[in-house]
UniProtKB/Swiss-Prot annotation:
The lineage of its organism: Bacteria, Pseudomonadati, Pseudomonadota, Betaproteobacteria, Burkholderiales. GO terms for cellular component: cytoplasm. This is UDP-N-acetylmuramate--L-alanine ligase. Keywords: ATP-binding, Cell cycle, Cell division, Cell shape, Cell wall biogenesis/degradation, Cytoplasm, Ligase, Nucleotide-binding, Peptidoglycan synthesis. It catalyses: UDP-N-acetyl-alpha-D-muramate + L-alanine + ATP = UDP-N-acetyl-alpha-D-muramoyl-L-alanine + ADP + phosphate + H(+). Its main location: cytoplasm. The gene is murC. InterPro entries: Mur-like_cat_sf, Mur_ligase_C, Mur_ligase_C_dom_sf, Mur_ligase_cen, Mur_ligase_N, MurCDEF_pg_biosynth, UDP-N-AcMur_Ala_ligase_MurC. PANTHER family: UDP-N-ACETYLMURAMATE--L-ALANINE LIGASE, UDP-N-ACETYLMURAMATE--L-ALANINE LIGASE-RELATED. Pfam families: Mur_ligase, Mur_ligase_C, Mur_ligase_M. It comes from Paraburkholderia phymatum (strain DSM 17167 / CIP 108236 / LMG 21445 / STM815). GO terms for biological process: cell division; cell wall organization; peptidoglycan biosynthetic process; regulation of cell shape. It is an enzyme of class 6 (ligase).
Length: 464
């Protein structure tokens, strides 16, 4: 590719999916430029690596580019897209560029409605501990690496495979993981769940004859597609028919202790430095792949015991002082679908038993709020205190009765928790300050702008 394409421009370079690919391309020696609406830590990092970053979108930003990379979040009337089309510069979907990177190495693609980022991070960490030095592209910041991407010298590239826009069908990896299949982003599939499941089946058909599908058989929808997967399968989970199976599972001091039973290898005792049964499942996928690639057991154990987590995936900010005296424990999480939220809340209950759980949640997308409304009411009613913001639109138009106030009213009617509604995330710190107590566990949660709140809470109040 490099002898033809030397300069690659990214529209929306600061996004989680785009920035990782851009960083790998910079490190491969390409000239990389990009634009975004505002500066953030990601754009600053890319600029320090040598990328040319423009704030704001303008046709002049693509000057000299041989290709322009876009995500599905970029509108077709974006001035840089219009300029590229006018100049006949190839406009490349993000997933197609990721597929191009995968052609350079052997791809390990992690798919599923929930758990992709954590599972991708665990796989990359275990392979790195085993000396395989993988390249990785992750949808969140791997805390141990300080970045969401890294160019390794090894044979493998580990990356998330995104089903939200069906773009994972552009990838042709040699190993695939499917963590679960759930009803999300249903507009992509015409609100037809059968079409969504068929897309995951088609994803497995992208594997070569020597490829492997690593599938979580705890998920009923994954189990349903098993008969239609024609490539070799490794089943993982808690289920009795799993080939890589967790037994003797215990939650202790925010960590998960378990034994991984393996069909073709001895059992291995694991201490996972993450809470929650869902993270045990994610770790089993990493153990399955590492075992297949002959990573030593001691390296697997060390990687999982030392795993420092991923930014905004049950990210702990430590103890934050309370104005009235004492302190609370602050955790931040990206969860924005009821299934993910329930798993995170369960993990928090396991990690902090007998603590009062306070949640500040920003719903993400009006369509998701509408489609999962009753499930949101149920899961949000399981916490002890709740602050709820208006929906983060992600570019969507408002939908009647699918806004934050409607959700607040429904939760209040359910009668299990009294929600506090605020219009914006800027009001969240004060709202929390009015209800938080010494000894509480506070979780900020959502995929939108609420991600800025924990840093403000910790910075303003001081982290111990």
């Amino acid at each position: 590719m490099k002898h033809i394409v030397k300069h690659i421009h990214f529209v929306g370079i600061g996004g989680a999916g785009m920035s990782g690919i851009a960083e790998v391309l910079v490190n491969l020696g390409y000239q990389v430029s990009g634009s975004d609406l505002s500066r953030n830590a990601v754009t600053e990092r890319l600029a320090a690596l040598g990328a040319r970053i423009a704030i704001g979108h303008d046709a002049a930003n693509i000057e000299g580019a041989n290709a322009v990379v876009v995500s599905t979040a970029v509108r077709s009337d974006n001035p840089e897209v219009l300029a590229a089309r006018h100049r006949r510069i190839p406009i490349v979907p993000r997933a197609v560029m990721l597929a191009e990177l995968m052609r350079l190495k052997q791809g390990i693609a992690i798919a599923g409605t929930h758990g992709k980022t954590t599972t991708t991070s665990l796989v990359a960490s275990v392979l790195a501990a085993g000396g395989l030095d993988p390249t990785f592209v992750i949808g969140g910041r791997l805390i141990s690496a300080g970045a969401n991407a890294r160019l390794g010298t090894g044979d493998f590239i580990v990356a998330e495979a995104d089903e939200s826009d069906a773009s994972f069908l552009n990838l042709f990896p040699v190993i695939e993981v499917i963590t679960n299949i759930d009803a999300d982003h249903m507009d992509t599939y015409g609100h037809d769940f059968a079409r969504l499941k068929q897309a995951f089946i088609e994803f497995t058909h992208r594997l070569p004859f020597y490829g492997i599908a690593v599938l979580c058989v705890d998920d009923p929808n994954v189990k349903e597609i098993l008969p239609f997967v024609s490539k070799p399968i490794i089943r993982y989970g808690f289920a009795p028919d799993a080939q890589v199976r967790a037994v003797n599972v215990e939650a202790r001091e925010g960590k998960m202790h378990f034994t991984a039973m393996r069909e073709d290898a001895p059992p291995i005792d694991i201490v996972l430095n993450l809470p929650g049964l869902h993270n045990v499942q994610n770790a089993l996928a990493a153990i399955a792949i590492a075992t297949e690639l002959e990573v030593k057991d001691a390296d697997i154990q060390r990687a999982l015991a030392d795993f420092n987590g991923v930014g905004r995936r049950f990210q702990r900010y430590g103890e934050v002082t309370v104005t009235s005296g004492g302190a609370y424990t602050l955790v931040d999480d990206y969860g924005h679908h009821p299934v993910e939220m329930a798993a995170t809340i369960a993990a928090a209950r396991g990690a902090f038993p007998d603590k009062r759980l306070v949640l500040a949640f920003q719903p993400h997308r009006f369509t998701r709020t509408r489609d999962c409304f009753e499930d949101f009411v149920k899961v949000l009613s399981t916490v002890d205190a709740l602050v709820l913001t208006e929906v983060y639109s992600a570019g969507e138009a408002p939908i009647v009765a699918a806004d934050g106030r409607s959700l607040t009213r429904a939760i209040r009617v359910a009668g299990k928790v009294e929600p506090v509604f605020v219009d914006t995330v800027d009001e969240v710190p004060d709202a929390l300050g009015a209800i938080v107590r010494d000894g509480d566990v506070v979780i900020t949660m959502g995929a939108g702008s609420i991600g800025s709140v924990p840093g403000r809470l910790a910075g303003n109040e001081g982290v111990k």
